[in-house]
Each structure stands twice: as C-alpha cells, then as structure tokens.
From Swiss-Prot:
Involved in the third step of the chorismate pathway, which leads to the biosynthesis of aromatic amino acids. Catalyzes the cis-dehydration of 3-dehydroquinate (DHQ) and introduces the first double bond of the aromatic ring to yield 3-dehydroshikimate. HAMAP family: AroD. Pathway: Metabolic intermediate biosynthesis; chorismate biosynthesis; chorismate from D-erythrose 4-phosphate and phosphoenolpyruvate: step 3/7. GO terms for molecular function: 3-dehydroquinate dehydratase activity. The gene is aroD. NCBIfam families: aroD (TIGR01093). Homodimer. GO terms for biological process: 3,4-dihydroxybenzoate biosynthetic process; amino acid biosynthetic process; aromatic amino acid family biosynthetic process; chorismate biosynthetic process. Belongs to the type-I 3-dehydroquinase family. This is 3-dehydroquinate dehydratase. It comes from Escherichia coli O7:K1 (strain IAI39 / ExPEC).
Length: 252
C-alpha cells in the first residue's frame, strides 16, 4: 500500500497521525488560536473554515490561511469546509463550496483539502484533478452524525472515494450501540486488507466509539483527531492523552 507524504509527514505507516481542528470565528481568533496550537503535540492542522464568519470574503479567508501557514510553517495544513448536512456550522451552495476549495488550492497556502464525497460526482472528480494539478492532496470524506450503516456500505463508500482518486478516504460515523463500533472496525480492517491501496481514516464517534480513535494502527486507520481545546466532534480526547496511548500501542 502506498503512503501519502505531506511536507515531512508520512501518512500510512507507523502510529496513526494526530489531526487537530482549529475552529476560529474571525481573523483575530485565528491568530490567537494559532499561537496556542503551536505549542501542542500534533501532526496535521485542520482549519475548519465553516466556523469562520467572514466566509463570503475570499481575501479574508486567505488572509487567515496565511496566518496559519506563517505561524506553523512545518505543519501540514488541511483546509476543511464541513457542510451543515454533514455536521458543519454553515450551509452554502455546491457552487460556493467548490469555489471556496478552488480558491484555497490556488492560494498555495494549503497542503490538503477536505472534499465531501456526496458533493456531486462530477464536481468531486473535477476538484480532485484540480487539486492534484496544484500539488494539493485530497482527504475525501463522509460523516453521519446519526447512525452507522452496514459494513458493506461503509466499504462501498471508502472504495468509491478511492475510485475518485482521493489521496486519503475518510469516514466518521455515529454508533447507536457498541456493536456499531465493531461494525466500523470490521469494515476498516476489511477495507485495509482487501481493497485499500492508500491510507484511510475511519472513526466511530461519541464516547462509545472512542476505542476506534485509539486502535487505528491495529485495524487500519492512518490518522485520528484529538482536541487541543474544544473538541470538533463527539468523542475526541486531548492530544497529549492521545499521543501517549498511540505510542503505547505502537511500541507494544
């Protein structure tokens, strides 16, 4: 299986990489949060742009991205607008969503974008090609904050992302029971062993699913999300605790 290298970080080998989400509402908070995050132990910085109030002002968005890039130049920067339908803060049109991601790609300030699988097949394929032409990696994602589908459906979605040439397919699901967590882990393992030719990221959310955020190296998830301050999704634990557990499991 091939790995994905962003800056000096190799994703898809060794312990799962830690992603943290920065969710600032304006440029002043982007600056202050970035300074606080700089001291934390993580691997990838995700900027959750859907929390940013001045979204319609592309210059403002890119000015904020520039602050993040300059404050943490060594960290891979993942640009993510999470749509309202997949658990994000704002709803925008598909056209605006694609335009926003293209502006981020054009800027040269971001290393990766998050692209939601169910944006529309043609738009997704075109945006992946556009990103790759500009040397930007694509995390293709799907989130369900209500339920966990059957393992076959989880695998089908991850395989579809792979067929659309995502660098890293990602799925996050809400368990209604502990057995839903096992479904997610079993699907992850089957995907990793039988179909994946690149790193994948999977997680089961909330307290019930916390084990999935820790056991990625065992079952085949290449990265996990931790919290520096406020969690960006239910079930995230602090980056320091997360690094400790991931290291213990890696060295066992």
């Amino acid at each position: 299986m091939k790995t994905v290298t962003v800056k000096d970080l190799v994703i898809g080998t060794g312990a799962p990489k830690i992603i943290v989400s920065l969710m600032a509402k304006d440029i002043a908070s982007v600056k202050s949060e970035a300074l606080a995050y700089r001291e934390a132990d993580f691997d990838i910085l995700e900027w959750r742009v859907d929390h940013y109030a001045d979204l319609s002002n592309v210059e403002s968005v890119l000015a904020a991205a520039k602050i993040l890039r300059e404050t943490m130049p060594e960290k891979p920067l993942l640009f993510t607008f999470r749509s309202a339908k997949e658990g994000g803060e704002q709803a925008i049109s598909t056209e605006a969503y694609i335009a926003l991601n293209r502006a981020a790609i054009d800027s040269g300030l971001v290393d990766m974008i998050d692209l939601e699988l169910f944006t529309g097949d043609d738009q997704v394929k075109e945006t992946v090609a556009y990103a790759h032409a500009h040397d930007v990696k694509v995390v293709m994602s799907n989130h369900d904050f209500h339920k966990t589908p059957e393992a076959e459906e989880i695998i089908a979605r991850l395989r579809k992302m792979q067929s659309f040439d995502a660098d890293i397919p990602k799925i996050a699901l809400m368990p209604q029971s502990t057995s839903d967590v096992l479904t997610l882990l079993a699907a992850t393992l089957e995907m990793q062993e039988q179909y994946a030719d690149r790193p994948i990221i999977t997680m089961s959310m909330a307290k019930t699913g916390v084990i999935s955020r820790l056991a990625g190296e065992v079952f085949g998830s290449a990265a996990t999300f931790g919290a520096v301050k406020k969690a960006s999704a239910p079930g995230q634990i602090s980056v320091n605790d997360l690094r400790t557990v991931l290291t213990i499991l890696h060295q066992a």
